[in-house]
């Protein structure tokens, strides 16, 4: 899968685990809701690490925890 798809799926999973909406995450992280929606809907070819970091802060996790998922295993990602 493409990296943007993995980021999207991971974010969707974290939102579901925490029972948060995109709007709620936007309010907690300071990342615009439209940006979060674009990430979830794979509208970006890539997402800046700074944005992922801000999202992680809103979720209350370290960036390493965000990427600690089978979704980001080398065999799951396209080169």
Task: Annotate the PLM regions.
Residues 11, 25-26, 36-39, 66:
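Conserved hydrophobic/aromatic packing and binding residues within compact polymer-binding modules
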Residues 12, 23, 53:
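Residues within the helices of the helix-turn-helix
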Residues 38, 67-79:
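Short, charged recognition helix plus adjacent turn
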Residues 31-46:
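Recognition helix of helix-turn-helix/homeodomain-like DNA-binding domains
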Residues 15, 26, 56:
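The alpha-helix within a helix-turn-helix
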Residues 43-57:
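Short, basic-rich loop-to-helix N-cap that marks the start of a DNA-contacting helix
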Residues 1-20:
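A short, Lys/Arg-rich alpha-helix, primarily the initiator
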């Amino acid at each position: 899968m493409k990296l943007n798809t993995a980021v999207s799926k991971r974010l969707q999973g974290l939102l579901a685990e925490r029972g948060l909406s995109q709007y709620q995450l936007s309010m907690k992280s300071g990342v615009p809701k439209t940006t979060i929606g674009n990430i979830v809907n794979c509208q970006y070819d890539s997402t800046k690490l700074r944005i992922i970091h801000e999202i992680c802060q809103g979720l209350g996790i370290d960036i390493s925890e965000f990427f600690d998922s089978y979704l980001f295993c080398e065999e799951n990602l396209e080169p």
